[in-house]
Amino acid sequence: MVFGIGSSGLAAVRALHAAGFEVFAGDDNQERREETEKSGAKWVSDPLEFDYKTLSAVVLAPGIPLHFPVPHPVCNLAVAAGCPLISDIELFGLAQTGHNPIVAITGTNGKSTTTALIAHILNQLGMTAVAGGNIGKNALDLPQYEDGKGTYVIEISSFQIDLCPRFRPDIAVLLNITPD
């Protein structure tokens, strides 16, 4: 299930549907239902009544609270059912075939500037690099490169990192940590 249908949620729906998965989707807001169903998902009208034991994972949008100020009820239901919670970035990492370097940037301030700058420098050096994640295109909407033909420079929020148990970028950049 994809829960939280903003731009990253829709990208996750499209990616999972394109990969042949049966996709369920939900949101506290019903406004994106039609667009979500057109993208290949079955809409879950009441996520609080859904059987999470039937799922492989729940992909949470970055804005869905996992811990603070309190977990969203969907998080509690999924965890109680033994269903893993993951982010779109985790899904992006799992979808990679072959080896194309991934540079992941996080921190309180300066993520977007650093992400854009690294991608620009790599491109100026003659490499093929694309910036995405929380800057520009969602990670799951980035082009799929042939093995070794491109570098992904991804801006990642702390909320997404919490839900990336297997994501292993080739380079990780932690800019700073300050109260926000």
Regions found by a protein language model. Name each.
Residues 53, 66-180:
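Phosphate-binding loop of NTP-binding sites
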Residues 1-87, 91:
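N-terminal leader/targeting and accessory segments in enzymes
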